[in-house]
């Protein structure tokens, strides 16, 4: 068993040895061949041709004799092959000629093909680009076709969207604002989803223009005589448009209503100041009250429930309304003051009553401005009175320039009353009839009484001091005029003229001035002045000349002209009337006290001027006290 197992091992080893030796022999033969035929046959050439390799290996395995005969055999084989080739060429020369021609033609055709291929290769890039463009255009055409097909299938829906601007414009122009707001909300949703589509952008822009037109129409409605329900609808639409904040909406509302009010006030004729201011009062009272009512019904002045967002400032919205009302009241007061300064005649009491009613109506909305009217009317009243007093002084001076002291029967009998004594109403003051003897004094008193009667229509107690001062200044000027007349005419006075001049001064100081004091006490009752100051009537003299002229001051410049008299200690009841107890306050609708109404005395035949009667004018409307 052991010997049997050994035999295959030795056989395998000998086979392996033989194969190895053969491989080594082939390697040696190849190396030998490579070194022998290095110059004739490159190694790469015979290695690539198997027949050359076999032949060389066959030669390397041949004997010496064979190697000697091999060149001859090769020469014979070569000669034989050459002969066969000649025979073949001779037998088939036509075929070879034809083949050569075909080969030449094929070469020529191959050249043409090569040239054509070159041109084709040169044109292939442009063809490739054209094909790409064609594919792209085909894809676009296909996409457009699909879009056109989709557009055709949804033609109705697209048409509705494209008609939105036209429909929006129709709704706005026909005042269908609710439908217009619904369309605007739908367009806003479209914009959020398809803002990149140009058609949608165009629709959005056209709808915005229609919304701007709608905004202008709504604000224009607020500039007309619109009622509260319509105001509520308009403000509701403006809030839905979400264009203004709450504060801006309030300002816009007030601006629009203010423009309407200004148009009404501008349309009032401005020729007659009284007509202009009465119509202005009526228009402001009615329309301003309506605007305030509308504002309070639409907007709430309560504090907001939620605090403002981050970055937003807290706006005092109630101050907007109060500031506007204050501005309107200020503008009305300016117009009132302007028209009063232009002059409204003797209708100041009627105008005061209308203004007071206007202010009273505004008290219901918390805008009572009656206190602002007092300075305006006081200033107008005192200015009118001062102007009338100044005109009276100028008129007195003109008459004194042409006045001559002439004795007349009326003068000599001045102590007696005229035959036809005028009849006066109870409670009125009768002017001194002795003034008829001296026309300048009579005319001066008449002018003063006209000023008093005009002042009586609107006579605040606060004007007592200014009226008294104005009257004192006028009397001081009259005194200077009298002194100037005396200096100019004294040298030419006769004894009779001197006596008449003394009577002139006496009547001026003892009749005219005390009568003016009594008129002042009727205009400004001492009891009323004391009640206003909150003092007893007996202490009124401590506060100066309130409501009466200081006669001694007026008398002092003329003292050297008057005759010397014994001092009398009894008080004249006419000069110092008994001060009544404070009168109870009158209700607003109570009639005013009886005015000072001078009576026209009889006029002598001597050509003296008549003392004009200045009866109280009848007011157009009941006046209210200040």
Swiss-Prot record:
A GO biological process held by the record: intra-Golgi vesicle-mediated transport
Origin species: Bos taurus (Bovine)
Its job: Required for normal Golgi function.
Region span, Disordered: 580-626
The gene coding this protein: COG8
Main location: Golgi
Lineage: Eukaryota, Metazoa, Chordata, Craniata, Vertebrata
Compartments where located: Golgi apparatus membrane
Stored SUPFAM superfamilies: Cullin repeat-like
Subunit architecture: Component of the conserved oligomeric Golgi complex which is composed of eight different subunits and is required for normal Golgi morphology and localization.
GO CC list: Golgi membrane; Golgi transport complex
Keywords assigned by UniProt, alphabetized: Golgi apparatus, Membrane, Protein transport, Transport
Domain of life (superkingdom): Eukaryota
Compositionally biased residues, Pro residues: 580-598
Membrane protein topology class: Peripheral membrane protein
Family: Belongs to the COG8 family.
Protein's recorded name: Conserved oligomeric Golgi complex subunit 8
């Amino acid at each position: 068993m052991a010997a049997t197992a050994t035999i295959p091992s030795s056989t395998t080893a000998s086979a392996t040895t033989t194969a190895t030796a053969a491989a080594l022999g082939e390697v040696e033969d190849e190396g030998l061949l490579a070194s022998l035929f290095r110059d004739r046959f490159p190694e790469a050439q015979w290695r690539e041709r198997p027949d050359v390799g076999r032949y060389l290996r066959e030669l390397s395995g041949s004997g010496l004799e064979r190697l000697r005969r091999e060149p001859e055999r090769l020469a014979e084989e070569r000669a034989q092959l050459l002969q066969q080739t000649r025979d073949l060429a001779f037998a088939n020369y036509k075929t070879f000629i034809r083949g050569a021609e075909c080969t030449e033609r094929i070469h020529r055709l191959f050249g043409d093909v090569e040239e054509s291929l070159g041109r084709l290769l040169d044109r292939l890039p442009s063809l490739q680009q054209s094909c790409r463009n064609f594919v792209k255009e085909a894809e676009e055409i296909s996409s457009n076709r699909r879009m056109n097909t989709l557009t055709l299938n949804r033609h109705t829906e697209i048409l509705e969207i494209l008609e939105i601007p036209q429909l929006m414009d129709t709704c706005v122009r026909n005042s269908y604002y609710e439908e217009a707001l619904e369309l605007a909300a739908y367009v806003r949703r479209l914009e959020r989803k398809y803002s990149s589509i140009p058609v949608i952008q165009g629709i959005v822009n056209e709808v915005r223009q229609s919304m701007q037109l709608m905004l202008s129409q709504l604000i224009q409605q607020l500039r007309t005589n619109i009622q509260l329900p319509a105001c509520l609808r308009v403000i509701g639409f403006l809030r839905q448009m979400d264009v203004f904040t709450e504060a801006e909406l309030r300002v816009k509302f007030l601006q629009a209503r203010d423009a309407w009010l200004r148009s009404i006030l501008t349309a009032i004729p401005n020729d007659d100041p009284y007509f202009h201011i009465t119509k202005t009062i009526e228009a402001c009272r009615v329309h301003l009250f309506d605007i305030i009512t509308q504002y309070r019904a639409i907007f709430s002045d309560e504090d907001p429930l939620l605090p403002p967002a981050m970055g937003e400032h807290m706006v005092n919205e109630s101050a907007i309304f109060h500031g506007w009302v204050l501005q309107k009241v200020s503008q009305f007061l300016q117009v009132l003051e302007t028209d009063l300064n232009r002059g409204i005649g003797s209708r100041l009491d009627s105008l005061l009553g209308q203004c007071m009613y206007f202010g009273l109506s505004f008290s219901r909305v918390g805008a009572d401005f009656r206190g602002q009217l007092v300075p305006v009317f006081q200033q107008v009243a005192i200015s009118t009175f001062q102007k009338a007093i100044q005109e009276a002084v100028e008129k007195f001076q003109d008459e004194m320039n042409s006045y001559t002291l002439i004795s007349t029967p009326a003068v000599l009998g001045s102590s007696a009353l005229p035959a036809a004594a005028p009849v006066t109403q109870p409670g009125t003051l009768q002017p001194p009839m002795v003034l008829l003897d001296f026309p300048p004094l009579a005319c001066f008193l008449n002018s003063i009484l006209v000023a008093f009667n005009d002042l009586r229509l609107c006579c605040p107690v606060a004007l007592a001091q200014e009226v008294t001062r104005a009257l004192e200044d006028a009397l001081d000027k009259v005194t200077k005029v009298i002194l100037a007349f005396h200096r100019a005419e004294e040298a030419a006075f006769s004894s009779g003229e001197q006596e008449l001049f003394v009577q002139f001064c006496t009547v001026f100081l003892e009749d005219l001035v005390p009568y003016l004091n009594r008129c002042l006490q009727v205009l400004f009752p001492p009891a009323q002045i004391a009640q206003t100051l909150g003092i007893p009537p007996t202490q009124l003299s401590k506060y100066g000349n309130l409501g009466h002229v200081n006669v001694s001051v007026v008398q002092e410049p003329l003292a050297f002209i008057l005759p010397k008299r014994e001092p009398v200690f009894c008080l004249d009841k006419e000069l110092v009337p008994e001060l009544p107890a404070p009168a109870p306050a009158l209700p607003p609708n109570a009639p005013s006290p009886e005015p000072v109404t001078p009576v026209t005395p009889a006029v002598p035949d001597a050509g003296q001027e008549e003392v004009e009667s200045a009866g109280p004018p009848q007011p157009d409307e009941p006046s209210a006290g200040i």
